[in-house]
């Protein structure tokens, strides 16, 4: 693993440690410029050595997989270093924020088609999203008019983050690369051919507000609105399929639907505004990756999804400028 900031310590490493205890993986190296941080992590993993440089770690440990959890502007070089050595990659989002970044991703994937270039897209493992997805994908397949509305509100950037990259929209992606990209990834799962048709962004770094409009299927539309200028932490997803008289709402820890005018009882569900819930989703993400990394078809699909989502994000950022 390269990068031992908040994402690594709160989510990646606990999930990897559980997999290590279960015997399905061994953490063989950790890399970070902070000596105390890397040594402390290495001490908790029986087979791990600590390194200050990624190239040195890759050469010394010859891993099967490199997990990248550094700031976004470092991702492409670290991915390239791994792929050139025949190492699969799992990289934190975002993988790129420009059309040039996407072109380089395509080039890397094209030169190493046997390797996985996967992204951390753990939201798809949330059970409430799987319920929304089953309802929404029918609209895509049927070519129905339908809408998906997403709202994410935060009172500023993550105060637990080890760095300030989230407040740097020009170089690191800002709120589009931090929050909106999670939902672009979910929309891409609904329709791999979806397309960004509009994006607006305003406000200074760290207090941004952005909205992204995405076309889904023949007649579906989604809007993802994300704000760092909020007063609370909240996540909401709303699906409306008029042809089926179906409305689905997932707002924080509450899930409800209305079908043919009949409302269901509200169900208590995991909330994506709860950091503990988001962090816990890394475990099923890693279980899926570990179980399928030897499957060439899975690797190809993961890489295609990575590039598709990166292209959506790059299009949104380009339109917002």
Regions found by a protein language model. Give the residues of each.
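N-terminal Rossmann-like dinucleotide-binding module
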Residues: 1-45
